[in-house]
């Protein structure tokens, strides 16, 4: 397969690794933090997926803009999933995920993304949406932290 020297090909890596960030606007809201980390990885994947697309192509700018808005929407969950603002944020996240899935599929139709990459990003978006849904159904998801010791059976008491 001949490569065009003007097209940058993303380096193949096992995972999308992002630098560790110590700033945590989520406090004790573990689920929102996990959702945000997922959204960060999706945004990074979108940037990699669109790296070789011309800057003048609206699909590139739209996909990247949507990933920024998704990050903003997930950041809105920091005050909680069940509060009135959390409900609005969840609705926005679901709408944004659906729009991003459509945009990623258009990238595939336009020949900018392989079927495999399109499928992976689509699944990651769907899983983010499902995670937000499941996290919104219980307060345990936001505030409860289990340690390894909490889950181990005390052998002395058995």
What is each PLM-predicted segment?
Residues 1-158:
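Amphipathic alpha-helical assembly/interaction segments
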């Amino acid at each position: 397969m001949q490569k065009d020297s003007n097209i940058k090909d993303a380096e193949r890596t096992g995972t999308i690794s992002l630098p560790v960030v110590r700033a945590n606007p989520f406090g004790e809201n573990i689920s929102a933090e996990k959702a945000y980390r997922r959204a960060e990885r999706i945004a990074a994947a979108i940037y990699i997926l669109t790296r070789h697309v011309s800057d003048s192509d609206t699909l590139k700018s739209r996909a990247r803009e949507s990933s920024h808005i998704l990050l903003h929407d997930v950041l809105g969950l920091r005050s909680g999933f069940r509060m009135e603002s959390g409900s609005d944020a969840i609705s926005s996240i679901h709408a944004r995920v659906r729009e991003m899935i459509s945009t990623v599929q258009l990238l595939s139709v336009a020949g900018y993304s392989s079927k495999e990459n399109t499928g992976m990003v689509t699944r990651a978006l769907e899983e983010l949406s499902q995670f937000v849904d499941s996290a919104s159904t219980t307060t345990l998801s936001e505030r409860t932290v289990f340690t390894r010791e909490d889950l181990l059976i005390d052998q002395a008491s058995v």
